[in-house]
Regions:
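RNA-binding basic/glycine-rich loop and surface signature characteristic of RAMP-family CRISPR effectors
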Residues: 1-235
Length: 235
């Protein structure tokens, strides 16, 4: 078994909903890691978005060498859950790497913390993914964070909690009259995440890699209003 590491940069605001009921002001919360409570994209949501993207890619690329073998890599369903066939690739959750914060010296700066860096180091070590001689610097580069913009874990948790992340009001109008007003939490644009794909020994499929890294990928809800446009890069 081998692993390949990818990063996600949010070009527009991202809403991958948790699907959980919320009694607070925010109607639609984003997904969070069950242990750290930091923002994430669950593996099932990520896999679904990448599968849909690859299916669209195939429609626009007729050459066999550019087509992604979706069934082979992602698996298939035949008439119900009991007849599912697993694909060759194992998708892990996309974990938060960094989030943007306002700055007096620039429009914004990316911030992260040592705990986030260490967790990615540990995963890379577990899966045998090399990060170079200076692993911390490599991860900070992936996160687009300078050393001086690392913050404490306490502050990073604060910056990513429900009170700090952006909340956008959505309104359903009928003949100019509001019929349904709701509030959605988003992971702000410029946020960065990282995820691993586990696969058989050897390099990751070239057609798949090209499909997800050569053009933007839409992840999550509300594509019609520009949410979820992301750039994915292989590390």
């Amino acid at each position: 078994m081998k692993a390949t590491l990818y990063t996600i940069e949010c070009i527009s605001n991202l809403h991958v909903g948790s699907g959980q009921d919320n009694d607070g002001v925010i109607d639609g919360l984003i997904q969070r890691d069950v242990v750290t409570d930091l923002p994430c994209i669950n593996a099932s949501s990520l896999k679904g978005a990448l599968r849909e993207h690859c299916e669209e890619w195939n429609k626009n690329h007729k050459e066999d060498e550019k087509k992604v073998n979706v069934v082979k890599l992602f698996g298939k369903k035949v008439g119900g859950e009991e007849n599912c066939e697993a694909g060759e690739y194992r998708f892990l959750d996309a974990s938060i790497l960094s989030i943007p914060r306002p700055s007096v010296n620039a429009p914004f700066v990316q911030v992260t913390c040592d705990e986030v860096v260490t967790e990615l180091q540990d995963k890379a070590s577990l899966f045998g993914v090399g990060l170079g001689d200076n692993e911390e610097k490599t991860i900070l580069d992936l996160a687009n964070v300078s050393e001086q913009n690392k913050c404490s874990y306490k502050d990073f948790k604060k910056y990513s909690n429900n009170d700090e992340l952006p909340v956008i009001a959505r309104n359903c109008l009928e003949n100019g009259v509001s019929k349904n007003l709701w509030y959605e939490q988003v992971l702000p644009r410029k946020s960065r995440l990282a995820f691993f794909i586990l696969h058989d020994d050897g390099e990751i499929n070239k057609a798949f890699d090209s499909a997800i890294t050569s053009v933007p990928v839409q992840i999550g809800a509300n594509a019609s209003v520009g949410y979820g446009i992301c750039v994915i890069k292989k590390c």
